[in-house]
Amino acid sequence: MAHLLVRLHGSLWELSCWQGCGASAWRDERVPLDPLPPRCPACGDLARPGVVWFGEALPQAEVEKAVEACACDLFLSVGTSSLVYPAAGLVREAQFHGAYTVEINPEATPATAAVDIALAAPADVVLPLIDSRLG
């Protein structure tokens, strides 16, 4: 069984250079206390979380991975407002490919009525339960 997790908005555990010196993103699962704030190992400038902030474009490679992942058996939409495209269109794309769709979100979204199952709860509650049943 293949699993694919696409982080359209990045990851807090990945850092990148604030100035974009060309250093590739690096992963750091610990909070570096020295120096604080963390620095780019290539140029010494400030590092920033490897996430997409408001007004920034989603990484095209991740968008392409997400669209390709819609050709699946099970599609989980977790913690999204389903308001902003291209992410808002992924549930419909997965359904087009015949996927069973599940939304996990405390609040109803525009996708709620379209998914096969809507679980109205926080991801940090639902995902461990799903994991324990699959594990």
Predicted regions and their residues:
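Conserved catalytic alpha/beta core of Sir2/sirtuin-type deacylases, generalized to analogous enzyme cores
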Residues: M1-G135
